[in-house]
Amino acid sequence: MGCVSSCFRVEDIDEYMNPNSSVYRNCPCIRCLAHNFLNLYISVFRRGETRSLPSSVQATASITSSSSHDNFLSEAFRSTPRPLPYDADPRYFRSLVSRREKGSSHSHEEVEPLRSDSDADSESFGVGGCKWANNKSTLSDKDSKEEYSSKSSLRILRSRSKSIMADSENMYILSEDEDVCPTCLEEYTSENPKIVTKCSHHFHLSCIYEWMERSENCPVCGKVMEFNETP
């Protein structure tokens, strides 16, 4: 009890309040013992931390050094300019431009002959079409001319036949009216008298004999000739 009561003396309150004082460390009360044990544990734990601190510091230092090295390498890699690809080379661009210009000129030259050939074909086709049309027109003209000539020749033949028939009819009429032989168109004489047939047609005697050697029909009407001899 004396040691417990001695912990609560008023004059030693400052020493008991200071944990680093000898009175505080040598106090046999439970509160002071627990506090001293806690302080001892904290001091031991701090020593372990201080001993383990260099390894962690080394690890952090190695990490920082490696990170700084990586940063340096990345900065160096970034700082060094990347080489231009072959596509970005101005000489390559110039060569590409020249090639494209050559290709475009070559294609233009190829298109020009094609156009000229197509124009020539169209012109030749147009000329050929014109010639064909002209030939067709000339053929149609020839056909029309031939048709017209054939029609005109038929008309001429018909007109001639009509005129011949008219002339023969007129001849028969004249022969009957003028009393001449229809075969020789000569007058009757005593030496060559007139012979009249039953079909009422008259001829020279010599003419009718010559006719009868070839046919027995009347040369005018085509009937069989029968004679009526007149003195």
Curated annotation (Swiss-Prot):
Gene3D superfamilies with a match to the protein in the record: Zinc/RING finger domain, C3HC4 (zinc finger)
Molecular functions per Gene Ontology: transferase activity; zinc ion binding
Domain of life: Eukaryota
Feature: compositional bias, Basic and acidic residues: 103-118
Residue ranges covered by zinc fingers (RING-type): 181-222
Enzymatic class: transferase
Region (Disordered): 103-125
Location of this chain's protein in the cell: Cytoplasm
InterPro entries xref list: Znf_RING, Znf_RING/FYVE/PHD
Entry EC no(s): 2.3.2.27
Catalytic reactions on record: S-ubiquitinyl-[E2 ubiquitin-conjugating enzyme]-L-cysteine + [acceptor protein]-L-lysine = [E2 ubiquitin-conjugating enzyme]-L-cysteine + N(6)-ubiquitinyl-[acceptor protein]-L-lysine
Entry GO CC: cytoplasm
UniProtKB keywords: Cytoplasm, Metal-binding, Transferase, Ubl conjugation pathway, Zinc, Zinc-finger
GO biological process: protein ubiquitination
Associated pathway: Protein modification; protein ubiquitination
Major site of localization recorded for this protein: cytoplasm
Family matches, as PANTHER family: RING-TYPE DOMAIN-CONTAINING PROTEIN, ZINC FINGER, RING/FYVE/PHD-TYPE
Domains as described in the record: The RING-type zinc finger domain mediates binding to an E2 ubiquitin-conjugating enzyme.
Function (record text): Mediates E2-dependent protein ubiquitination.
Name the UniProt record assigns to this protein: E3 ubiquitin-protein ligase At3g02290
Organism the protein comes from: Arabidopsis thaliana
Lineage: Eukaryota, Viridiplantae, Streptophyta, Embryophyta, Tracheophyta
